[in-house]
């Protein structure tokens, strides 16, 4: 990586550049499993994993929750307004360099404050965007994706593209227009649409079909404008079932895929899937990844984990090796994520308030996914599950099963077969055996 842009302040004083020291290292500021240059399956770990740091949780979050005030100690937070925005850029690129992180991601309002008018807001964005572009040029760090924050400001109380207020729809369009221009200017490899407040609380005051139609209209406008300005990055949509609204329109992978297909958007969008959102939807993360993968719509990942005992978006750093292994299994089976990556949409706990906790947390997440990648690659290489699945469905490779697959069977022929074939014998699914094998691979690979 090229030498970084200089900064007058050392924001992460006790942390040097994080390097790989191996699994026997006791240094908390070293990678134990993530060796960026290690080659697995013909690609380096850095190429496989495409790690990205989320600007919002890392540099703007202050630890405020519904029960208490801010707790985070950040060397840059005594600044205000645009000065604060500039200091955050310096801190961000210092951290990217220390972690050798190849990508980052942001909402528009993460990097620059809103002004008193849309024009002033865009001027603020332009100023910080110029600074970021300079740092990107000097560091080699790239923008994985950007998006528009259309949920914080009170104007979006009823939603953005699904708002009942046409003035809000227009403002949201202007904001995404600027976001797409930002994406092109900074070379974003993707542009994300997250539902924010695109949903509803009660059907008593909601025209559901009208709102879905408007959401689709909005996205088609975005597709058209991207073509107009020559932005060729991948469009991504991020499912979430609830929070902040009771019923989010992009509930889960299946619902979102149905929406994209219904409105003719599936050739323009892929899915950005978040582990914690899968938990909120009552799914495993690997279920969501598989659902997107089999439809050819797996685009990128927000890497985090939810707390199984809590019913809200906790956005914890991913440390569950079962989850990272099964996630990487799906990603490898997908042939990778293309222009997507693993973006750490995760925040340190409110009680982990020192700057170095940000470094520890990202090391933990990067190591967890590196370990998951290695185990998943070995599982695929050894055909541990593939052979089991192939054997399990073998009845469809011959006889009546093959007739079904080839379209030669119908209800009449199948009824005749069932009448003549009096004995049905099922075989065990061996679920416990397979879980034991998975344990063995996680522990020994």
UniProtKB/Swiss-Prot annotation:
Cellular component (GO) terms are: cytoplasm
What keywords would UniProt list here?
A: Carbohydrate metabolism, Cytoplasm, Isomerase, Magnesium, Metal-binding, Xylose metabolism
PROSITE patterns, sorted: XYLOSE_ISOMERASE
- Which reaction(s) are listed as its catalytic activity? alpha-D-xylose = alpha-D-xylulofuranose
Q: Which domain of life is it from?
A: Bacteria
The molecular function terms of the Gene Ontology recorded here are: hydroxypyruvate isomerase activity; magnesium ion binding; xylose isomerase activity
**Residues the entry annotates as binding Mg(2+) 1:** 238, 274, 302, 345
What cofactor does this one take?
A: Mg(2+)
Q: Where in the cell is it found?
A: Cytoplasm
Family membership noted in the UniProt record: Belongs to the xylose isomerase family.
The annotated subunit structure for this chain is: Homotetramer.
What's this protein's name? Xylose isomerase
**Native species:** Bacillus subtilis (strain 168)
**Chain's gene name:** xylA
């Amino acid at each position: 990586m090229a030498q970084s842009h200089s900064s007058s302040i050392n924001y992460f004083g006790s942390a040097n550049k994080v390097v790989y020291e191996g699994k026997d290292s006791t240094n908390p500021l070293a990678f134990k499993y993530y060796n960026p240059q290690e080659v697995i399956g013909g690609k380096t770990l850095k190429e496989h994993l495409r790690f990205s740091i989320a600007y919002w949780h890392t540099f703007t979050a202050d630890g405020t929750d519904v029960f208490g005030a801010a707790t985070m100690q950040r060397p840059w937070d005594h600044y205000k307004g645009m000065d604060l925005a500039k200091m955050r850029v310096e801190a961000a690129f210092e951290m990217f360099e220390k972690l050798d992180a190849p990508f980052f991601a942001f909402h528009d309002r993460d990097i620059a404050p809103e002004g008193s008018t849309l024009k002033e807001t865009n001027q603020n964005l332009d100023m910080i965007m110029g600074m970021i572009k300079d740092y990107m040029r000097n560091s080699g760090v790239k923008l994985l994706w950007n998006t528009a924050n259309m949920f914080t400001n009170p104007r979006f109380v009823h939603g953005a593209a699904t708002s009942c207020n046409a003035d809000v729809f227009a403002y949201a369009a202007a904001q995404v227009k600027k976001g797409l221009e930002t994406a092109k200017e900074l070379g974003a490899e993707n542009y994300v649409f997250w539902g924010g407040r695109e949903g509803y609380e009660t059907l008593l005051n909601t025209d559901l079909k009208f709102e879905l139609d408007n959401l689709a209209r909005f996205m088609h406008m975005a597709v058209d404008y991207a073509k107009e300005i020559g932005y060729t990055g991948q469009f991504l949509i991020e499912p979430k079932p609830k929070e902040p609204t009771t019923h989010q329109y992009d509930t889960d992978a299946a619902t979102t895929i149905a929406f994209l297909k219904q409105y003719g958007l599936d050739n323009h969008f892929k899915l950005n899937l978040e582990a914690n959102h899968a938990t909120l939807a009552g799914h495993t993360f690997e279920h969501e990844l598989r659902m997107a993968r089999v439809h050819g719509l797996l685009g990128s990942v927000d890497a985090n984990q939810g707390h199984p005992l809590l019913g809200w978006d906790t956005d914890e750093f991913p440390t569950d090796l079962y989850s990272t292994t099964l996630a990487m299994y799906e990603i490898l089976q997908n042939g990778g994520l293309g222009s997507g990556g693993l973006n750490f949409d995760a925040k340190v706990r409110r009680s982990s308030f020192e700057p170095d906790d940000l470094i520890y947390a990202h090391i933990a997440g990067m190591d967890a996914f590196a370990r998951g990648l290695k185990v998943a690659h070995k599982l695929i290489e050894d055909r541990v599950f593939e052979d089991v699945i192939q054997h399990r469905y073998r009845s469809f490779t011959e006889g009546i099963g093959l007739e079904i697959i080839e379209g030669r069977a119908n209800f009449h022929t199948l009824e005749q077969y069932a009448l003549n074939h009096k004995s049905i014998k099922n075989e065990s699914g061996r679920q416990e055996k397979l879980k034991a094998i998975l344990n063995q691979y996680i522990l020994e690979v």
